[in-house]
């Protein structure tokens, strides 16, 4: 009986851990002068695998919960990267080119991820 209770508790814990995370795949199109925003409201860290599948370079930035923006990398066409982001951080995918950017993202982590486009701020 103890073994059965332990097994049920273990399975419940595994299901809860699985439900708390989410795997998302997205093929993004980012127009000239725009950036895509992912996240900003997660309660835990999350991971992003990105591959630039388009004709122009993209910039990957991290915006912290305090709105501090840090460059995390630049992806030329065909390049890939895997990055980890802290709880509450947002990933900014900024189009650096004069054509529409394309990028494939695989996101793993908490499922409360905001996704939207916004104009690139003036520097």
Which role does the model predict for each range below?
Residues 1-5:
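Positively charged n-region of N-terminal signal peptides that target proteins for export
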Residues 7-14:
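Bacterial N-terminal signal peptides
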Residues 25-35, 39-41, 77-78, 88:
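Tight coil/turn sites that cap or link beta-strands
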Residues 44-48:
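Structural beta-strand segments of beta-rich domains
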Residues 50-54, 93-97:
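Asparagine-centered strand-capping/turn motif at beta-strand->loop junctions
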Residues 55-71:
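Short, surface-exposed beta-strand/strand-loop-strand elements in extracellular ectodomains
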Residues 67-88:
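Intrinsically disordered, low-complexity Pro/Gly/Ser/Thr-rich segments with frequent PxxP/GP/PP motifs
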Residues 97-123:
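C-terminal partner/receptor-binding element of secreted or periplasmic proteins
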């Amino acid at each position: 009986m103890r073994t059965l209770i332990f097994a049920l508790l273990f399975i419940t814990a595994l299901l809860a851990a699985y439900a708390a995370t989410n795997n998302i795949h997205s093929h993004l199109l980012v127009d000239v002068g725009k950036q895509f925003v992912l996240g900003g409201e997660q309660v835990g860290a999350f991971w992003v695998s990105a591959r630039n599948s388009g004709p122009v370079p993209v910039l990957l930035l991290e915006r912290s919960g305090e709105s501090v923006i840090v460059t995390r990398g630049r992806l030329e066409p065909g390049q890939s990267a895997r990055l980890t982001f802290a709880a509450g951080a947002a990933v900014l995918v900024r189009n650096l080119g004069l054509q529409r950017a394309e990028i494939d993202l695989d996101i793993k982590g908490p499922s409360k991820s905001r996704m939207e486009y916004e104009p690139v701020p003036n520097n």
